[in-house]
A protein has these predicted regions:
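Conserved, function-defining micro-sites of small-solute handling proteins
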Residues: 1-126
């Protein structure tokens, strides 16, 4: 049996076309795009499972704070647009956004989380 993990925006067209079957979503909550598909935590033995893909806008170190803040404000404005929000939701994406300092903490937490998973798995680079 072939199985894969993919992010929802790229897999959703194939699921809707009947070319793929969604067994579960990896987020902690069901997706509005696939409300009948359970989460992994609901469907199986992995309680508390939560693994989502995310995208961020980053700038080079040393970028002036006023530029970073302007980029964040304009991004938040775009993501708050009803048209863009609806488009992203229809593709299975969840529009979000964080202040720069919060996003930095989020990235650090994700790095710690996945470093622990890699260490526990014993995976090594060949």
């Amino acid at each position: 049996m072939d199985v894969m993990f993919d992010n929802l925006p790229s897999a959703l067209p194939q699921i809707k076309a009947g070319k793929l079957i969604a067994l579960a979503v990896t987020s902690s909550e069901r997706s509005a795009a696939l409300p009948d598909v359970p989460t992994i935590a609901e469907a199986g033995p992995v309680k508390g499972f939560d693994a989502t893909s995310w995208f961020g806008l980053l700038a080079p170190a040393g970028t002036p704070a006023e530029i970073v803040n302007r980029l964040q404000q304009e991004s938040a404005k775009a993501l708050g647009s009803p048209a863009l929000k609806e488009r992203l939701l229809s593709q299975g994406a969840l529009p979000g956004g964080m202040a720069p300092a919060d996003f930095g903490r989020f990235i650090a937490a994700e790095t710690r989380k996945w470093a622990a998973v890699v260490k526990a798995s014993g995976a090594k680079v060949d």
